[in-house]
A protein has these predicted regions:
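Non-catalytic connector elements of ABC transporters
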Residues: 236, 247-354
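Conserved ABC transporter NBD signature motif
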Residues: 57-65
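ABC ATPase nucleotide-binding domain helices that frame the ATP-binding cleft
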Residues: 42-45, 141
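Helix-to-loop junction immediately C-terminal to a conserved catalytic motif
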Residues: 49
Protein backbone atom coordinates (compact mmCIF):
# COMPACT_ATOMS: atom_id res chain seq x y z
CA UNK A 1 0.00 0.00 0.00
CA UNK A 2 1.44 3.39 -0.99
CA UNK A 3 -0.18 5.57 1.70
CA UNK A 4 -1.38 4.43 5.12
CA UNK A 5 -2.96 6.86 7.57
CA UNK A 6 -4.01 5.75 11.04
CA UNK A 7 -5.85 7.70 13.76
CA UNK A 8 -5.07 11.17 12.42
CA UNK A 9 -6.17 14.05 14.65
CA UNK A 10 -5.68 17.79 14.41
CA UNK A 11 -6.96 20.64 16.59
CA UNK A 12 -6.81 24.36 15.93
CA UNK A 13 -7.46 25.73 19.39
CA UNK A 14 -10.69 24.11 20.54
CA UNK A 15 -11.76 23.28 16.97
CA UNK A 16 -11.33 19.58 16.13
CA UNK A 17 -10.46 19.91 12.42
CA UNK A 18 -9.54 16.25 11.80
CA UNK A 19 -11.08 13.57 14.03
CA UNK A 20 -9.57 10.06 14.11
CA UNK A 21 -9.17 9.69 10.33
CA UNK A 22 -7.72 6.45 8.90
CA UNK A 23 -7.39 5.30 5.28
CA UNK A 24 -5.19 3.47 2.75
CA UNK A 25 -4.41 4.50 -0.82
CA UNK A 26 -3.00 2.13 -3.45
CA UNK A 27 -0.11 3.22 -5.68
CA UNK A 28 -1.13 5.06 -8.83
CA UNK A 29 -4.69 5.82 -7.70
CA UNK A 30 -6.31 9.22 -8.13
CA UNK A 31 -8.30 10.10 -5.00
CA UNK A 32 -10.90 12.84 -4.69
CA UNK A 33 -11.09 14.30 -1.17
CA UNK A 34 -14.63 15.65 -1.12
CA UNK A 35 -16.82 17.43 1.40
CA UNK A 36 -18.30 20.74 2.50
CA UNK A 37 -16.18 23.70 3.57
CA UNK A 38 -14.66 23.22 7.01
CA UNK A 39 -14.91 19.43 6.76
CA UNK A 40 -11.18 18.83 7.24
CA UNK A 41 -10.14 18.10 3.65
CA UNK A 42 -7.36 20.66 3.32
CA UNK A 43 -6.08 19.91 6.83
CA UNK A 44 -5.61 16.25 5.87
CA UNK A 45 -3.85 17.29 2.66
CA UNK A 46 -1.51 19.66 4.51
CA UNK A 47 -0.62 16.98 7.06
CA UNK A 48 0.23 14.55 4.27
CA UNK A 49 2.45 17.23 2.78
CA UNK A 50 4.14 18.01 6.10
CA UNK A 51 2.84 21.59 6.13
CA UNK A 52 0.90 20.83 9.32
CA UNK A 53 1.82 18.41 12.10
CA UNK A 54 -0.90 16.06 13.42
CA UNK A 55 -1.66 16.10 17.14
CA UNK A 56 -1.51 12.32 16.99
CA UNK A 57 -1.76 9.52 14.45
CA UNK A 58 0.59 8.00 11.88
CA UNK A 59 1.29 8.78 8.22
CA UNK A 60 3.26 6.17 6.27
CA UNK A 61 4.51 6.19 2.68
CA UNK A 62 5.45 2.71 1.43
CA UNK A 63 5.45 1.52 5.04
CA UNK A 64 7.84 4.24 6.24
CA UNK A 65 6.68 6.61 8.98
CA UNK A 66 6.99 10.18 7.65
CA UNK A 67 5.53 12.24 10.52
CA UNK A 68 8.99 13.58 11.40
CA UNK A 69 10.04 14.37 7.82
CA UNK A 70 10.08 17.92 6.45
CA UNK A 71 7.90 18.66 3.38
CA UNK A 72 10.92 18.66 1.05
CA UNK A 73 11.94 15.23 2.37
CA UNK A 74 8.64 13.50 1.64
CA UNK A 75 8.84 13.37 -2.16
CA UNK A 76 5.64 15.33 -2.69
CA UNK A 77 4.44 17.62 -5.47
CA UNK A 78 1.87 20.24 -4.43
CA UNK A 79 -0.48 22.18 -6.73
CA UNK A 80 -2.24 25.15 -5.16
CA UNK A 81 -5.60 26.69 -6.02
CA UNK A 82 -4.03 30.03 -6.98
CA UNK A 83 -1.24 28.48 -9.12
CA UNK A 84 1.54 30.07 -6.95
CA UNK A 85 3.75 30.59 -10.02
CA UNK A 86 6.82 32.81 -9.87
CA UNK A 87 5.71 35.93 -11.75
CA UNK A 88 9.23 36.97 -12.71
CA UNK A 89 10.05 33.56 -14.23
CA UNK A 90 9.16 32.17 -17.64
CA UNK A 91 7.19 28.97 -18.10
CA UNK A 92 10.47 27.12 -18.64
CA UNK A 93 12.07 28.50 -15.47
CA UNK A 94 8.96 27.87 -13.37
CA UNK A 95 8.95 24.21 -14.38
CA UNK A 96 12.71 23.95 -13.87
CA UNK A 97 12.69 25.52 -10.40
CA UNK A 98 12.48 22.33 -8.35
CA UNK A 99 15.12 20.64 -10.48
CA UNK A 100 17.51 23.54 -9.97
CA UNK A 101 16.98 23.31 -6.20
CA UNK A 102 17.93 19.63 -6.42
CA UNK A 103 21.00 20.63 -8.49
CA UNK A 104 20.07 18.42 -11.43
CA UNK A 105 22.61 18.50 -14.27
CA UNK A 106 21.76 21.05 -17.00
CA UNK A 107 21.34 18.47 -19.75
CA UNK A 108 19.03 16.29 -17.65
CA UNK A 109 17.15 19.38 -16.44
CA UNK A 110 16.47 20.59 -19.96
CA UNK A 111 15.38 17.13 -21.08
CA UNK A 112 12.95 16.81 -18.16
CA UNK A 113 11.50 20.31 -18.61
CA UNK A 114 10.92 19.82 -22.33
CA UNK A 115 9.35 16.42 -21.65
CA UNK A 116 6.87 18.08 -19.29
CA UNK A 117 6.25 20.99 -21.64
CA UNK A 118 5.23 18.46 -24.28
CA UNK A 119 3.25 16.34 -21.81
CA UNK A 120 1.21 19.29 -20.54
CA UNK A 121 0.53 20.81 -23.97
CA UNK A 122 2.66 23.91 -23.40
CA UNK A 123 4.93 23.66 -26.43
CA UNK A 124 5.62 27.14 -27.79
CA UNK A 125 4.91 28.83 -24.45
CA UNK A 126 8.29 28.15 -22.82
CA UNK A 127 9.44 31.79 -22.93
CA UNK A 128 6.17 33.35 -21.81
CA UNK A 129 5.56 34.77 -18.35
CA UNK A 130 2.53 33.88 -16.16
CA UNK A 131 0.71 37.15 -16.95
CA UNK A 132 0.82 36.20 -20.64
CA UNK A 133 -1.05 32.93 -20.04
CA UNK A 134 -4.70 32.00 -19.58
CA UNK A 135 -5.92 30.51 -16.31
CA UNK A 136 -5.91 27.01 -17.78
CA UNK A 137 -2.38 27.43 -19.11
CA UNK A 138 -1.13 28.70 -15.74
CA UNK A 139 -2.59 25.66 -14.02
CA UNK A 140 -0.84 23.40 -16.53
CA UNK A 141 2.45 25.11 -15.67
CA UNK A 142 1.71 24.49 -11.99
CA UNK A 143 1.10 20.80 -12.71
CA UNK A 144 4.31 20.54 -14.72
CA UNK A 145 6.34 22.25 -11.99
CA UNK A 146 4.94 19.88 -9.36
CA UNK A 147 5.75 16.83 -11.50
CA UNK A 148 9.25 17.95 -12.51
CA UNK A 149 11.17 16.47 -9.53
CA UNK A 150 9.33 13.15 -10.07
CA UNK A 151 7.52 13.08 -6.70
CA UNK A 152 6.02 9.88 -5.32
CA UNK A 153 2.80 11.67 -4.39
CA UNK A 154 0.94 14.57 -6.03
CA UNK A 155 -1.35 16.71 -3.85
CA UNK A 156 -3.78 19.19 -5.38
CA UNK A 157 -5.76 21.72 -3.32
CA UNK A 158 -8.90 22.63 -5.33
CA UNK A 159 -6.81 22.91 -8.51
CA UNK A 160 -9.68 24.05 -10.76
CA UNK A 161 -11.47 26.46 -8.43
CA UNK A 162 -10.02 29.62 -9.99
CA UNK A 163 -10.80 28.60 -13.58
CA UNK A 164 -14.01 29.26 -15.54
CA UNK A 165 -16.48 26.42 -16.07
CA UNK A 166 -15.66 25.51 -19.69
CA UNK A 167 -11.89 25.37 -19.15
CA UNK A 168 -12.43 23.53 -15.86
CA UNK A 169 -14.32 20.80 -17.71
CA UNK A 170 -11.49 20.44 -20.23
CA UNK A 171 -8.85 20.34 -17.49
CA UNK A 172 -10.69 17.56 -15.66
CA UNK A 173 -10.34 15.22 -18.63
CA UNK A 174 -6.78 16.38 -19.22
CA UNK A 175 -5.78 15.76 -15.58
CA UNK A 176 -7.26 12.26 -15.64
CA UNK A 177 -5.29 11.38 -18.77
CA UNK A 178 -2.12 12.97 -17.39
CA UNK A 179 -2.26 11.01 -14.11
CA UNK A 180 -2.86 7.77 -16.01
CA UNK A 181 0.15 8.43 -18.26
CA UNK A 182 2.48 9.42 -15.43
CA UNK A 183 1.19 6.75 -13.03
CA UNK A 184 1.62 8.88 -9.91
CA UNK A 185 -0.49 8.50 -6.77
CA UNK A 186 -2.57 11.67 -6.49
CA UNK A 187 -5.03 13.26 -4.07
CA UNK A 188 -7.08 16.32 -4.97
CA UNK A 189 -9.32 18.35 -2.68
CA UNK A 190 -12.64 19.56 -4.06
CA UNK A 191 -16.11 20.58 -2.89
CA UNK A 192 -17.50 19.84 -6.38
CA UNK A 193 -19.03 16.36 -6.39
CA UNK A 194 -19.32 16.27 -10.20
CA UNK A 195 -15.59 16.91 -10.41
CA UNK A 196 -14.80 14.13 -7.93
CA UNK A 197 -17.16 11.63 -9.58
CA UNK A 198 -15.80 12.34 -13.06
CA UNK A 199 -12.08 12.33 -12.27
CA UNK A 200 -11.35 10.12 -9.24
CA UNK A 201 -10.69 6.39 -8.98
CA UNK A 202 -11.96 6.61 -5.41
CA UNK A 203 -13.63 9.32 -3.35
CA UNK A 204 -13.11 10.05 0.33
CA UNK A 205 -15.99 12.06 1.79
CA UNK A 206 -15.29 14.14 4.89
CA UNK A 207 -17.64 16.05 7.17
CA UNK A 208 -16.95 17.74 10.52
CA UNK A 209 -13.43 16.33 10.54
CA UNK A 210 -14.50 12.71 10.10
CA UNK A 211 -14.06 10.39 7.13
CA UNK A 212 -17.64 9.40 6.33
CA UNK A 213 -16.92 6.95 3.51
CA UNK A 214 -14.22 5.88 1.05
CA UNK A 215 -15.00 4.03 -2.17
CA UNK A 216 -15.47 4.25 -5.92
CA UNK A 217 -17.86 6.93 -7.18
CA UNK A 218 -20.31 4.20 -8.20
CA UNK A 219 -20.22 2.45 -4.81
CA UNK A 220 -20.66 5.69 -2.90
CA UNK A 221 -23.59 6.78 -5.05
CA UNK A 222 -25.37 3.43 -5.00
CA UNK A 223 -24.47 2.29 -1.47
CA UNK A 224 -23.98 5.29 0.83
CA UNK A 225 -22.92 4.21 4.31
CA UNK A 226 -24.19 7.22 6.24
CA UNK A 227 -27.14 9.63 5.94
CA UNK A 228 -24.68 12.46 5.29
CA UNK A 229 -23.12 10.68 2.30
CA UNK A 230 -26.56 9.78 0.93
CA UNK A 231 -27.72 13.39 1.07
CA UNK A 232 -24.42 14.95 -0.02
CA UNK A 233 -23.81 12.90 -3.18
CA UNK A 234 -26.28 13.37 -6.00
CA UNK A 235 -29.71 14.98 -5.99
CA UNK A 236 -32.34 13.59 -3.67
CA UNK A 237 -35.45 14.19 -1.59
CA UNK A 238 -35.48 13.59 2.17
CA UNK A 239 -38.74 12.25 3.66
CA UNK A 240 -39.62 11.77 7.32
CA UNK A 241 -42.47 9.27 6.89
CA UNK A 242 -41.93 7.02 3.87
CA UNK A 243 -44.80 4.75 5.00
CA UNK A 244 -47.17 7.36 3.53
CA UNK A 245 -45.96 6.44 0.02
CA UNK A 246 -47.62 3.61 -1.87
CA UNK A 247 -45.65 0.37 -1.64
CA UNK A 248 -43.77 1.45 1.48
CA UNK A 249 -46.56 1.13 4.05
CA UNK A 250 -44.62 -1.57 5.92
CA UNK A 251 -41.26 0.21 5.80
CA UNK A 252 -41.81 1.66 9.27
CA UNK A 253 -41.97 5.14 10.64
CA UNK A 254 -41.06 7.11 13.72
CA UNK A 255 -38.91 10.04 14.75
CA UNK A 256 -35.70 8.09 14.11
CA UNK A 257 -36.65 6.82 10.64
CA UNK A 258 -35.94 8.87 7.53
CA UNK A 259 -35.91 8.10 3.82
CA UNK A 260 -33.86 9.49 0.97
CA UNK A 261 -35.21 9.07 -2.56
CA UNK A 262 -33.08 9.83 -5.61
CA UNK A 263 -34.70 11.25 -8.79
CA UNK A 264 -33.92 8.11 -10.80
CA UNK A 265 -35.86 6.01 -8.28
CA UNK A 266 -39.07 7.78 -9.31
CA UNK A 267 -41.19 7.66 -12.48
CA UNK A 268 -43.73 10.34 -13.31
CA UNK A 269 -46.11 10.53 -16.26
CA UNK A 270 -49.63 10.14 -17.56
CA UNK A 271 -51.64 7.05 -16.63
CA UNK A 272 -51.26 5.34 -20.03
CA UNK A 273 -47.44 5.36 -19.66
CA UNK A 274 -47.50 2.81 -16.81
CA UNK A 275 -47.94 -0.94 -17.28
CA UNK A 276 -48.74 -1.37 -13.57
CA UNK A 277 -51.07 1.53 -12.87
CA UNK A 278 -52.20 -0.02 -9.58
CA UNK A 279 -48.72 0.54 -8.10
CA UNK A 280 -48.77 4.28 -8.87
CA UNK A 281 -50.35 7.09 -6.91
CA UNK A 282 -51.64 10.51 -7.83
CA UNK A 283 -49.37 13.52 -7.91
CA UNK A 284 -49.45 17.11 -9.12
CA UNK A 285 -46.62 18.71 -11.08
CA UNK A 286 -45.31 21.61 -9.01
CA UNK A 287 -42.44 22.91 -11.11
CA UNK A 288 -40.36 21.97 -14.18
CA UNK A 289 -36.66 22.71 -14.74
CA UNK A 290 -35.17 22.33 -18.22
CA UNK A 291 -31.69 20.81 -17.90
CA UNK A 292 -30.68 20.57 -21.55
CA UNK A 293 -30.82 16.78 -21.89
CA UNK A 294 -33.89 16.20 -19.69
CA UNK A 295 -36.54 17.77 -17.48
CA UNK A 296 -36.20 17.94 -13.73
CA UNK A 297 -39.75 17.55 -12.40
CA UNK A 298 -40.89 18.60 -8.93
CA UNK A 299 -44.06 16.69 -8.13
CA UNK A 300 -46.28 16.82 -5.04
CA UNK A 301 -47.53 13.48 -3.71
CA UNK A 302 -49.74 14.03 -0.69
CA UNK A 303 -47.70 16.12 1.74
CA UNK A 304 -44.40 15.20 0.06
CA UNK A 305 -42.56 17.05 -2.68
CA UNK A 306 -40.44 14.69 -4.80
CA UNK A 307 -37.91 15.32 -7.57
CA UNK A 308 -37.45 13.14 -10.63
CA UNK A 309 -36.22 13.21 -14.23
CA UNK A 310 -38.29 13.01 -17.41
CA UNK A 311 -36.96 12.36 -20.90
CA UNK A 312 -37.37 15.05 -23.55
CA UNK A 313 -38.67 12.32 -25.87
CA UNK A 314 -41.80 11.94 -23.75
CA UNK A 315 -44.76 14.38 -23.90
CA UNK A 316 -44.03 17.52 -21.91
CA UNK A 317 -45.73 17.96 -18.57
CA UNK A 318 -47.05 21.27 -17.25
CA UNK A 319 -47.23 22.81 -13.76
CA UNK A 320 -50.52 21.95 -12.08
CA UNK A 321 -51.02 18.83 -14.21
CA UNK A 322 -52.30 15.71 -12.42
CA UNK A 323 -49.98 12.77 -13.07
CA UNK A 324 -49.22 9.28 -11.82
CA UNK A 325 -46.12 8.68 -9.72
CA UNK A 326 -44.25 5.44 -9.04
CA UNK A 327 -41.53 5.32 -6.38
CA UNK A 328 -39.38 2.26 -7.13
CA UNK A 329 -37.10 2.31 -4.09
CA UNK A 330 -35.90 4.43 -1.19
CA UNK A 331 -32.78 4.58 0.95
CA UNK A 332 -33.88 4.24 4.58
CA UNK A 333 -31.88 4.95 7.71
CA UNK A 334 -32.27 5.33 11.45
CA UNK A 335 -29.83 5.78 14.33
CA UNK A 336 -28.59 2.19 14.03
CA UNK A 337 -28.41 1.23 10.36
CA UNK A 338 -29.21 2.10 6.75
CA UNK A 339 -30.64 -0.01 3.94
CA UNK A 340 -32.30 0.08 0.51
CA UNK A 341 -36.04 -0.62 0.52
CA UNK A 342 -37.81 -1.74 -2.68
CA UNK A 343 -41.44 -0.90 -3.44
CA UNK A 344 -43.21 -4.04 -2.21
CA UNK A 345 -46.08 -3.76 -4.71
CA UNK A 346 -43.78 -3.96 -7.71
CA UNK A 347 -43.32 -7.10 -9.78
CA UNK A 348 -41.26 -6.01 -12.78
CA UNK A 349 -37.75 -4.57 -12.27
CA UNK A 350 -37.10 -0.86 -12.41
CA UNK A 351 -36.45 0.25 -16.01
CA UNK A 352 -32.95 1.34 -16.87
CA UNK A 353 -32.89 5.01 -17.93
CA UNK A 354 -30.03 5.81 -20.29
Amino acid sequence: MHIEVRGLNKHFGEFHAVNDVSFDIAKGHLIGLLGPSGGGKTSVLRMLAGLEQPDDGEIRFHGELVNHLLPQERGIGFVFQNYALFKHMTVYDNIAFGLKVKKVAKSALKERVMELVELTGLSGFEKRYPHQLSGGQRQRVAFARALAPEPQLLLLDEPFAAIDAKIRQELRSWLRELIERVGITSIFVTHDQDEAIEVADEIMIMSHGRLEQKGTPWDIYKEPKTPFVASFIGESTMIDDVSELKGFEEAGSGSEMRALIRPEYIEVGEAHEFKMLSVTEEGVVHRLHFRGSEWMVEVEVGSHKLMTYRSLEKPALTPGQHVRVLVHRAYLFNNERSWMEENRLKVDPMPVII
